[in-house]
Each structure stands twice: as structure tokens, then as C-alpha cells.
Amino acid sequence: MPFLGQDWRSPGWSWIKTEDGWKRCDPCSHELRSEDSQYTINHSIILNSGEEEIFNNECEYAAKKRKKEHFGNDTAAHSFYREKWIYVHKESTKERHGYCTLGEAFNRLDFSSAIQDIRRFTYVVKLLQLIAKSQLTSLSGVAQKNYFNILDKIVQKVLDDHQNPRLIKGLLQDLSSTLGILVRGVGKSVLVGNINIWICRLETVLSWQQQLQNLQVTKQVNTGLTLSDLPLHMLNNILYRFSDGWDIVTLGQVTPTLYMLSEDRRLWKRLCQYHFAEQQFCRHLILSEKGHIEWKLMYFTLQKYYPTKEQYGDTLHFCRHCSILFWKDSGHPCTAADPDSCFTPVSPEHFIDLFKF
């Protein structure tokens, strides 16, 4: 039977809860220190010069050893999850016991720093949204805490730089719906932690939603070159780069020129052709009074029935040779002869599917 003591006869360690977490306390430490201070004797009284030099050397060596051990423990604590990859295994083998869970992968892949990278931001937000919809209760307690810490950083980032508020509003809407169902249906599903924790999380999410609702984007005073100063063909080229219809609509509200360009039928036709198949067009064909196809209305109509293609600047990758999930920039210790041929981009949906057993 495992025992948390230095000696098998001892009653175990005592712990005290502080603001920084649980810390081990020694009930006899204060009495020993007070007694030690009372009976401290100057060692020079009982030692001669030669013995005193040996005593000082031993004390110095012991101090250096303690400092080295402390530094080693501190370094190990900081670099425990330094590697930004994880081995994905779904069954026990002779070499590996157990299996990798979604919560473990979520903790190991360093999503906290990934949100600071503009290429990975949308990918991480989409992944958090999928977890909020269906996988929140499958996370461990540590993974859930990490999840909400990352979400807090995302909300603060949006409030500070005023970028991607619509994306985060959608995430918080799905999360608040899930938390509301879990809180109202307490007892119907297994929740990790006390119900009060989940109520507190729901209140926090509602507070974040209110902050984003009150977000006011201040107009920047810029005396340099602005978007409206660019030629029409460059503005049109920028609009054709967008893959989200709502981004086109939002940009069209900036100036009358951009509004005129955003209403171009060819722009919306290409957007529909990019996201949807021709068979889907025929099922939801929308014509104007003059008999022309309303591509803009068709895009938003088709969006309700079919999923749109998603683009990400950077995604997680899976190595088929090593069965390792990793960020491509960080890499992983691959043993394949041609590593690049073994890499497969992992979409947020595929990431969730990897951990369904």
C-alpha cells in the first residue's frame, strides 16, 4: 500500500492550503528552530583553527549542493512540457501502457502560446469551439482549467487589439449554451468538479459576452496611407482574397467605394464556387426579377445548409510514421527516411476524432 511518508511508521505529511496552492508543513519545524536558536553556540569556541577550516569547507560544499539541487528541480519543473508534440496511441502495448486522451493532448500542445501567433489563432478558436459543443465534459479537471485559462487570454487579447470579435462571440455563444444545459441538467451527466464551479464558469462566460458586446472600436487617427487611398484594382484584389462572406460585408461598410466593390456579382459567384458544389447550387437557386442569379443571397442561404471550407494559416500536423501530433514549426523527433511525406495536416474536426475511442 503506498504511503506518503519518509518512514513506513510515520503518519504521513501534513499539508496546509495557501493562496498559491497546497504546501507541506512541518508541525515541529517552528519548535526546532526556536530551540536551535536558543542553543546555538559559536563553533569557534569548541573548534581550533584547523578544524574550523574543515567545518567551513563542509558547510560551503553542502550549501552549493543544495543550491544545485534546487536549480535542477526548478529547471525540470519549467521544462516538463517543453516539447510541443505528443505521441497519440489508442491502446496499451508492451512499451506503452494506457492511451492518450484529449485532455492530455490539450495540455501538452501549448495552445496558450499558439493564440499569440496570428496564423494559429483561428485554428485554436475553432478547436475550442468544437470542444465546447461536444467534448467539454470529457476533459480532465486540469485540462478544463487550462481550457478556461486559454479562453480568458483569448478574450483579453480581443478586448485589447479589437481583432476577431465576431469569431469569439460565436465561441462564447456555443460555450454558454453548453454550460447552461449542463448546469440545468445536473445529475444527468458526470461533471468533473463541484456544480458551483460550473455555475461560476457560466457566470464568467456571460461576463465575457457582456464585455465583448460593449466593445467599442475607436477610430484611429492616421495621417499616412489608408485603405481608401489604394487604387480600385488593388481594393478589388483584396476583396477577392477573402474566404468569409461576412468579412466582405463588413469591409464594404467602411467607404462607399468599398461598398460598391463588395456588391460585385462576380465576387460572390466565385465565393460560392469556392465553398459549394454545383449540385448544391441547383437545389437552392435564387433568381432576381430580371432572371439573374443572386449570388450573394445564395451564399448566405447555402451557408445555412452546408459547411463552408475553412482556411488556416498554420495547423497541427500528424506524422503517420511516428504517430505523433505536433506543430509544424516546432517539429518532432522523426525517424522516417523522408519525414515530409509522412506529415498530414490535422483539421480541428480530425483533432477531435483522433481521441474518440
From Swiss-Prot:
Keyword hit for Nucleus: yes
Chief localisation class: nucleus
Compartments, as annotated in UniProt: Nucleus
Domain F-box: 225-273
Classification via InterPro entries: F-box-like_dom_sf (IPR036047), FBX25/32 (IPR040394)
Expressed in which tissues: Expressed in all tissues tested, except striated muscle (at protein level). Expressed predominantly in the cerebral cortex, the hippocampus and the Purkinje cell layer of the brain. Intestine and kidney show also significant levels.
Pathway per the UniProt entry: Protein modification; protein ubiquitination
GO terms classed as biological process: protein ubiquitination
GO cellular component: nucleus; SCF ubiquitin ligase complex
CDD domains: F-box_FBXO25
GO MF, one example: actin binding
Keyword list, A-Z: Actin-binding, Nucleus, Ubl conjugation pathway
Gene3D superfamilies attached to this UniProt entry: 1.20.1280.50
Chain positions covered by the region annotation Interaction with beta-actin: 1-83
Subunit structure of this chain's protein: Part of a SCF (SKP1-cullin-F-box) protein ligase complex consisting of FBXO25, SKP1, CUL1 and RBX1. Interacts directly with SKP1 and CUL1. Interacts (via C-terminus) with beta-actin (via N-terminus).
Function, as annotated: Substrate-recognition component of the SCF (SKP1-CUL1-F-box protein)-type E3 ubiquitin ligase complex. May play a role in accumulation of expanded polyglutamine (polyQ) protein huntingtin (HTT).
Entry remark concerning the domains of this protein: The F-box is necessary for the interaction with SKP1.
Protein name per the record: F-box only protein 25
Source organism per UniProt: Mus musculus (Mouse)
